[in-house]
């Protein structure tokens, strides 16, 4: 009997697609409309695919198959983000070269993806570890190295939009005369300090016990190495940085035109952290009043300088209206002014504090919950608005990488400053008070009434007297204790004082960003080598000057190494490479040494979407004409975990290439969708009291008493209960809850968790494909619910869609025959009106659902069609063939088999998508629900377009409705044509 047999059908069609290169997009520029659909390509781990991967891949595959059938040129590709830590860690443990491990893992991933029938153009496949690929990763890095950002340059791009700020060739950087006069080396150092790719001393995670630098993800929250649980300390190493901060404004503002989820846009904006405020200089020169006054007079003449000198500490604040409340200053321990500001008697304390701060991560330092620590430098600064001298402290909650690395501390109006002031008994001066309407003021102590004063500038408001603050007041209000600004509303005060500071030459309006430059180097082997030479002096020591590797010498290929053990020092692993790779001498005798850091895993994934459009080009990273045709990516689907870093880094690289004229689009990804997570199957837990009696989960809460040895307790008594793991046959669904089969009053706890090895709930797609077939897996993952939502796995759900595919097969195939042939009910007869209506409604609904990425509802429509047609004694071929085309994007193997059975000799991959006829969808009658007091009690059929009177009359005459109305008083009848009839009744 020719039953539906996925294990026979699917390998057959996968081989057919491979042999006929069905989904290959020919090289060159095609005619017609394009559709570039891209998955976030995976890291090929040793674990292979899990069932979460195919969710996004199936969604993009449906879109691509649908687009091909619409006649569009589709670019749909797959590759491998294959540099990374796991392969190198495996090499350290086993001695197996990372390349061997990576290639083995890629082979497994490719096998799994092909078994799922995705319509990738495999001729464009590449891995970021391919030298032919990372040659161009290195080339793009050199474009960053060759670029400086002209913040004042106004220009119009190929998209017709005018922007301010542009990346320009380093050769166009204006060189000051004094730098030119100092010679070539000085000019080169000046250029190096302005490049988008530059070197800078940055703290890294150094583990002495392991003898290596660790990535942040390899360090636990307790500051220990993930491997071995060894102490990790922070050390400064010279690192490569990318000046992403230069593009902060454009990265933030140009999100607006992208079709991305609002949540992702918000995450990126928050990460960039744009804020409006003011820069203010606090005087640290002569401690005398005369010195301060002389400085202010000079500033009034010369204005606010672009860069601060040694006489000031420059701060950035979003609340210039609180300047009068600054009672101390805080510098980051790494601030360059700390050494000269620290007095002799404070030197030992400051040095020890800086040493301890250097051991902490930025995350630990800025943790709001941690105890505030700090040390006084012994020096003072003068507040420019009131001449008050305030002490200068250092504290680790201030980061040198944010703002200016110095803050004015206003403890009355900032939570961290308040906690610090309380810890060290520093003054707290309130300078902003809340504005309270007189009608809402309640004064219990009538003696306080004499202290209330009216605010003439805000009629109806009063000033509430200052009381000792129990916490920082961080809201807006009006100014107090702020000299001539008293009484001004916060927003007005901000505007006024920014202008006054500018006029006095001690401050100015400013924009700041939380975003920091991108630390771009790693001390690893398995990453792209930097295409950079360091120049050495005659003794072999670095001169501090660097030069780019010539384009003709790219790629700089990773050297063959057998020893992947850490060096035991902060030197990168590549420092152990053979000398013939490490060193060279130029024709004019300059000694060179290669950069021995490697690029991070992010590098290769920053631009892979460009290479897919032209993967075999040996002359350019992408042909200009192909870039113009294929870019931007029309639909990009991937996990929300990449919402910030990967997407931000890709956008940054793309904008630099855009500025340099290498690409014509300002953004890489026009539409972004984050698929939801597929969770493990729900875990069912019941609860028993001390007597073994079942209690409802609704009467139980998690135990918060550490002294009690129990995970859960009774909500009302706090007595412990025992959690019991239940099996599926012990429970049943009742409404929104799961209950015990033996006692339906007992609600059990049902929770789905992220799939993980530790929970033992990981599902391997190979197992599903083997048992049910790839089409069932694809269909189930799309049927689980909306694409963007998290959804729990259910084997019964897989079984359900498998049965649906079996029904679709039987609808067309005669399972009673000895060989596969059409069901006798399938006939070459014209469809009747009802059959045409079912078909065209399904065509319309499925197409619209695919356009909206609402795949679960599209599948529901096809299930409805199958149920309706299966009930027909005669099934016109004219409605079945279009249905097979609708099914094709979702279950392509089955669709191809049925298409062939209908006598077609070529793949349906490029068959035209069925078109619906609006005239065939209209019905002569429509079904309208009838409600009694808002609850549906019956349904009636009325002519299409029936008016209110017809609706009411038909409903009143319906026997079912009459039964519900009997003995009741009809107060009102609401009839909405085409929608509903509602009887409002009494009695």
Q: Whereabouts are the PLM-identified features?
A:
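Conserved oxyanion/phosphate-binding beta-strand-loop segments in alpha/beta enzyme cores
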Residues: 1-38, 68-77, 101-107, 260, ...
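Long, charged, mostly alpha-helical binding arms that flank functional sites
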Residues: 4, 277-279, 433-461, 466-468, ...
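Residue patterns forming the tRNA-binding/recognition surfaces of aminoacyl-tRNA synthetases
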Residues: 3, 16-20, 94-313, 406-549, ...
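Flexible, glycine/threonine-enriched loop-and-boundary segments that flank and lead into catalytic domains
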Residues: 263-314, 359-388, 392, 518, ...
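N-terminal catalytic cores of NTP/NDP-binding nucleotidyl/phosphoryl-transfer enzymes
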Residues: 26-102, 126-137, 317-318, 322, ...
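Helix-rich, typically C-terminal accessory recognition domains appended to large enzymatic cores
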Residues: 81, 152-159, 193, 198-205, ...
